Amino acid sequence: MLRYNFRYLHNVLSHTVVFCFTEVSLHIVKQLGVESYACTVHASRFQKSYSASIDYCQRFLFSSNLKHNYVNLNIIFTSCIFRSLREFLRFYIAAIMCFL
């Protein structure tokens, strides 16, 4: 049981860290004055996409899937975190392209 709780906490914290880095990144890009139309459009698309990713994760967090064994739950969390990281990387690539 302790092992299950540790894995659950680790996955929730990992997802939270990704979310925080994303929020900080958006703030930094805004502070740098990247106000071109393409960047603004991308930022709003990214926020919508990331929000959808968060919603996707929360559906699993608070659904009956928590009753599944920890192996299945770990797979769900891992895919959830990778989905968030993918959005995070897409944002950085687009932000770099805006500066070029």
Curated annotation (Swiss-Prot):
Species classification: Eukaryota, Fungi, Dikarya, Ascomycota, Taphrinomycotina
Species of origin: Schizosaccharomyces pombe (strain 972 / ATCC 24843) (Fission yeast)
Subcellular location: Cytoplasm; Endoplasmic reticulum
Name by which UniProt lists this protein: Uncharacterized protein C29A3.21
Annotated GO CC locations: cytoplasm; endoplasmic reticulum
Major subcellular location class: cytoplasm
Superkingdom: Eukaryota
Keyword entries, A-Z: Cytoplasm, Endoplasmic reticulum
